[in-house]
Amino acid sequence: MSRVFKKTCSNGKLSIYLGKRDFVDHVDMVEPIDGVVLVDPEYLKGRKMFVMLTCAFRYGHDDLDVIGLTFRKDLYVQVQQVVPAESSSPRGSLTVLQERLLHKLGDNAYPFTLQMVVNLPCSVTLQPGPDDTGKACGVDFEVKSFCAENLEEKVSKRDSVRLVIRKIQFAPLEPGPGPWARLCRRFLLSAQPLLLQAWMDKEVNYHGQPISVNVSINNSTNKVIKKIKISVDQITDVVLYSLDKYTKTVFVQEFTETIAANSTFSKSFAVTPLLADNCHKQGLALDGKLKQGDTNLASSTILRPGVDKELLGILVSYKVRVNLMVSCEGILGDLTASEVGVELPLILMHPKPSNEAASSEDIVIEEFAQQEPSGESQEALAAEGNEGS
């Protein structure tokens, strides 16, 4: 059974069909966007029909536009003329889903295929505050279709149909070794140093799964370690127009472990940063949203050699911090306590899902609410039910 996403413009004359809304970046290529557009022939009336792919960086909200504060930059725009098809446009073979849709929808349906370039960012959304309205800040992708005499003609929202998609990356199948860090710290009146080592078993960790952080301590000093604090920070770099950097702690936990002077310690700790524990932190980077509640903490940005960082708009990275609370022995020891620690880079991503091809010729269409002329409506999915091919 094949799942198809459908959206119709508010005048009901133009509909767009896509087989999926998540398109995978495989580093050397990105999955093509193949779909079908259905148009009322009376509405077309000899005009041209276009399909447009836009990757945009938004830093600001629609309601600020009246005072000129909204910041939006189109990072990439690709336009394909679908009707009449241009002879210069590459014409590849139709996908199985396109063939089924064309057979089902009839002569007024037209296929299209868009191919992203490889140096575009993945979809990222900055978590809005409780009073924020309009589109969230971040990087988003949109497929739009409209009819016009030419590309210079101004087309109203009522006469166009737009569907948000996502560009995503999955973790590499063969990740490298886990990160490792070491700290040697000497203290006054202690002949020997404190040695702290921390490492992770894997280079890449998955969203929602515990991260194993291994800690080894050789305390050859006269100090006492009262507790171990492990935290995970998300670092978001807005690189398109400025050097803004935001650091948000997405996990922190203190472990009461007493490590006496002239002793050793070794233990593995499990930490799990989750969006559910950070849902009220404004400015937190999330994987791009398609509908309410369908996302998670943003995946780490994987940079390709030679890519212009400004084209990526927003860069996301993570680090794990392991801190020791070190104090002197005795009642007044806590008054002179100090922290020492190390940092580990963390790559947080989704595992690559198994490819399960649809074997049935049935099509299930999930239709979105028609978009309102005044702007984007809430994209609530309503299953249209099982549609035969």
From Swiss-Prot:
PROSITE patterns named among the record's database cross-references: ARRESTINS
GO cellular component: photoreceptor inner segment; photoreceptor outer segment
Disulfide bonds: none
Secretion signal, residue range per the UniProt entry: none
Predominant location: other
Keyword terms: Cell projection, Disulfide bond, Sensory transduction, Vision
Name of the protein described by the UniProt record: Arrestin-C
Protein's cellular compartments: Photoreceptor inner segment; Cell projection, Cilium, Photoreceptor outer segment
GO biological process, one term: visual perception
Gene3D superfamilies: 2.60.40.640, 2.60.40.840
UniProt feature coiled coil, ranges: none
Tissues in which the protein is found: Expressed in cone photoreceptors in the retina (at protein level).
Function: May play a role in an as yet undefined retina-specific signal transduction. Could bind to photoactivated-phosphorylated red/green opsins.
